[in-house]
């Protein structure tokens, strides 16, 4: 499965200082790309899904699926910024 990243997602990921968190998030994304395994995820709103990483503050990656073969990573965050991250994800998706 092809996984694409928005500039907003890349900016968020690059700012993560916790190397273990980066590794865990990268591993989750890699499993989607190579094994079509999504792990702990759920729909949140309007075609946007939340991938939950159970580490640290509860990292979240918001994504949408286009067809059966493309996943677009919209933005990331954690449990404390969940609502604002969902709103940002909606805006990013609207502009894609």
Show which residues each predicted segment covers.
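Solvent-exposed, charged helical/coil patches
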Residues: 2-30
């Amino acid at each position: 499965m092809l996984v694409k990243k928005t500039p907003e997602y890349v900016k968020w990921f690059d700012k993560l200082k916790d190397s273990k968190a980066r590794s865990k998030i990268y591993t989750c994304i890699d499993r989607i790309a190579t094994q079509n395994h999504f792990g702990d995820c759920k729909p949140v709103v309007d075609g946007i899904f939340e991938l939950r990483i159970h580490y640290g503050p509860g990292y979240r990656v918001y994504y949408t699926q286009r067809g059966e073969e493309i996943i677009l990573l919209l933005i990331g965050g954690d449990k404390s910024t969940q609502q604002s991250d969902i709103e940002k994800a909606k805006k990013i998706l609207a502009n894609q």
